[in-house]
């Protein structure tokens, strides 16, 4: 899951409804503390898989240093020398009693995960 537009973050780094699966290349907080950064070759491979399967996708950031953001376990998996990137759908009101997502994004995520499992 990735938050949609937040008032403290730049819009160009935000996820949008209706634009598909979201990839978060870099995750972490306070600089390099508990962080993960997918390498360019792995990101290129994922992009190729999504393009070949005609899956709509976008990139976004989980937050902004010292202004809050999302948490992830990607760094734990990366500690085992795995190539890791976070992916999900844009969510409005994340972790609130009523969360909102787009059906289009959910369907593209489903298609993207199927394509990844077939090709990776």
Question: Where would I find each of the regions flagged by the language model?
Answer:
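Active-site-adjacent substrate-binding region
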Residues: 4-98
């Amino acid at each position: 899951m990735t938050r949609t537009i937040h008032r403290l973050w730049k819009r160009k780094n935000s996820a949008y409804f209706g634009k598909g699966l979201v990839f978060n290349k870099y995750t972490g907080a306070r600089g390099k503390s508990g962080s993960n950064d997918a390498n360019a070759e792995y990101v290129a491979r994922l992009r190729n898989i999504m393009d070949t399967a005609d899956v709509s996708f976008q990139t976004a950031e989980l937050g902004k240093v010292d202004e809050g953001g999302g948490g992830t376990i990607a760094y734990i998996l990366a500690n085992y020398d795995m190539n890791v990137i976070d992916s999900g759908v844009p969510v409005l009101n994340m972790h609130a009693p009523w969360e909102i997502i787009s059906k289009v994004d959910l369907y593209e995520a489903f298609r993207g995960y199927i394509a990844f499992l077939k090709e990776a």
